[in-house]
Amino acid sequence: PVIFRHYNNVALSQEQNGGFGSISQTTHNHNGHNASTSDGASNAHFYPGQFYDYHWSTTLARADMTNTQATDPRASGPDGNGRLVHVPGDYRELQGTLWFHDHRFFYTAENVYKGHVGMMNYYSGKDRANEALQDGVNLRLPSGTMLDYGNTDFDVNLMFSDAASDPDGQLFFDIFDTEGFLGDMLLVNFAYKPFFEVMPRKYRFRMLGASMSRWYKLALVNQAGKVVPVQVIATDGNLIPRPVTVNQMDTMASGERFDVIIDFKPFKVGDRLYLVNLMEFEDGRGPKDKLSISDALRGKTLDPGVGRVLEFRITRHMASVDMPGYVYDSQRAADQDRSQVPAVLTEQIPIVAPVRERIIEFKRGADDARDATVNGCFPSCPAERETPWGIRINGEDTHSLNANRISMLVPRPGEVEHWTLLNGGGGWDHPAHLHFEEGVTISRTGFAMGAAERGARKDVWWMGEGGSVKIQVRFGEYGGAYVTHCHNTVHEDAAMLLRYDILTDPNNPNTSQTHVQVIPTPNPTPDGVTYVMPEILPEGTPFHRSFRPFPRTST
C-alpha cells in the first residue's frame, strides 16, 4: 500500500492562477482499485494550505472471493530481492500503466491542463519490469536488468497532449466552450516535437492519451515513410490475452492507454523513425477523419495536430537511468537485449450471465435544475458557465453532475452487471470512463471493435456519434461513492458525470466494512466539512419497486 499525501500550495488568489482552474484540488488515481475515500472523485476536494492523504491499496481485485489464501504465484508482486510476495485476488486483474490527475468537479479539464497530471506504473510478479529474471512467472518484457523490478531504461512512458498559448506564451483556455478544447501544439511528455534516442533493440512504450478533447491514431514509419509494425501488449494498463501486431494502433481517446513493443534491432545507428498521428480534428466534437500515412506526412490538413509527433534516433550508446553513471553499448555482449514477448500474456475473463443490466446514455441536455439555490448543484456550479451535458439511466430523466445524487446503486460486491454505454448522438463523440472497476467489452455498434480491445480489460470506451458499447463489470470488495463520466474532460466539467455507490457485505470479513449502507456526502469548504445525505434515483436502485433489472434498448 501507498500513502500519497497531496499538499495544496496553489495561490489563494484566483488572479494569480492564470484566469482559469480551481484553487481547490483533488487527485484521482486513474484505474486504481481503491476505497472511495481515496478515489479522488467522492467530492473530497481541499483548499490552499490544506492536504489530503490518499491510501492507494495496490491490492488485486476479487481479493474477497478469488485466491483468498494467496496461493497463486501469478497473483504476486516483487519483493526487491528476486522473489515474490503472494497476495489474494485474481491475477487476471493485475494492473500496469496507470496515471493520476486532478478530479475537482466542474474544473477537471482546467486543472489537468495546467499540469496536475502524471503517469505511474504498477509492477507485479508477471510484469515486474526485469527482462532477465526467469522464475516461471515473470514475462520478461522489455525493460532492463539493473534493478530487481521497475527498470525503465527500455520501458518508457509517453504522455500525449495538446496545448495552446496566448501572445505572452502562457497557456490559453476558453472556459465558455463546452464542446471540447483543441490545442495547436501537440506535446509528448510536455515537449513540442521531441526526439528520443534508442538503441537497436526492443523497447516497451506505455502511451497515454492525456488531451482534453483530442484523440490519437498513431503509426510508426521509417525515414522513407514506410510503415513499421508494432506489437500491442496492453490497453488501459491491462495486459491483453495475446500480443497483436498492427500497422496502425487503435484510436487512443482521452484517458486511454496502449502499451506497445517496438523492435529497433532491424535499424542501424543513425537511422530515424517517427510516430505519426493520423487523426484529424476540426473542433472538439470528435474526430473529423483518419488520414492516410502519406497524406499525414505531406500535411494535407489544416489540423496542426496531424503528422510527426515524436522522432526516434538510433544510437550505439545510451546512459542508464536505472544505474546512473553506466553507459550502454549496443555492441557489448553484456548489454544485449534479453527481453521477450510471449505468445500468451494473460487469460481472458469470461463473459457470464449478469445479475442485472443497465443502459447508460451520454447525451446533450438535462432535465434537472442547475440553480444552486434549489440544490441543483453539488458542489456549487460555476455561475458563469453553461452545463449542457447529462447522462440518462434506463431511459428515464437525464441528469447532470450532482455529487449528492446517486444515479446507480450496486447492492453487494461480487455481482456482475452488463452495461450498455450509449452515445445519444447530436454530432459529438464520448469516451466513457468507469472509476474503480474495469470492464470487458462484449460488443460494439457504430464501428468495429479494435484489434487490442477484444477480450481485454478496459476502463475507457470510446463511442462515436450514435454508437454504443456493451461491457461486463464485476464490482469488488470496496464500497462507497464512485463515478462514471465522459473523459472528454470539457464535457465532464459541463456536467456529463454520474455518481454510483457500492454497498459492502457486512458478513464477509474480506470486504470493506465501512459502506454497508449509504453514507452522507462530504461538502468541503476552506473552514471545514459538512455532510449531507444523498438523493438516490429510483431507476438506479434495485431496492426500489420501479427498478427494471433488464431494461430494453434498441441498440
Describe the role of every protein-language-model region.
Residues 19-52, 228-248, 293-294, 298-311, ...:
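Active-site pocket scaffolds in enzymes
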Residues 125-152, 317-331, 504-521:
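Low-complexity, Pro/Ser/Thr- and charge-rich linker/hinge segments at domain boundaries
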Residues 1-35, 42-112, 119-131, 137-152, ...:
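Beta-strand cores of secreted/periplasmic/IMS beta-sandwich domains, seen most often
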Residues 338-345:
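An extended, acidic, His-containing surface patch that forms the Zn2+-binding/catalytic region
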Residues 81-82, 100, 187, 235, ...:
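General secondary-structure edge motif
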Residues 109-110, 117, 160-161, 183-185, ...:
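Generic secondary-structure boundary/loop-capping signal
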Residues 31-63, 160-338, 447-449:
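Histidine- and aromatic-rich segments of cupredoxin/plastocyanin-like copper-binding domains
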Residues 15, 38, 65, 113, ...:
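Generic domain-boundary/flexible-linker signal
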